[in-house]
Amino acid sequence: ALYENENWVPMGFTYDCYVTADQLERVSEEERAQILCRAILLDDDQISAFGSLLEPLPDEELTNRGEDAYAADCAARRAAGVAAFTATDTGFTAKTAYDADELVFFSVPYDDGFSATVNGEPAAIEKVDDGLMAVYVPAGENEIEFTYHTPGLKVSACVSAAAIVVYGVYLLWIIRKRKSQPGSKR
């Protein structure tokens, strides 16, 4: 028989609640993942910016763990999933259709090489949940595009090309120097 994970979550979804680092530290490391399925971890600046979109996670929810609670949290994340998620050669795209403004979470590691647009306009990428990504979207239908460019790749390619040119000039100089010396083979 083939195993089927009934508690799957989509790559992109929204939350109803946020949790603080202080709250999360009160939960054992082994059980933090379950809390992060229930609420998004935001820092103080993010709470100031996006707290109006989410409710703070009540402290009693930190102890409400178990298989049934986990299954309910996963079902809630599936229900709040993006309408479509597609991997591309340079990143990924997602389509959303939420009734209200939302902070959309993606279970993709944050990296400075990512840039994002929402409906073609540049969007700030939030580093949430200790290293994953989220982006703000307004109510209604939206197209989100994340594009990845390796940081420093263009600079390193230019440096490498310059080094090849310098090496080529050096080789030409050596060849000409040897040819100009008396008694050298031609």
Feature locations, PLM:
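Extracytoplasmic
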Residues: 1-75, 99
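Active-site-proximal, structured, solvent-exposed surfaces of multi-pass membrane proteins
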Residues: 44-186
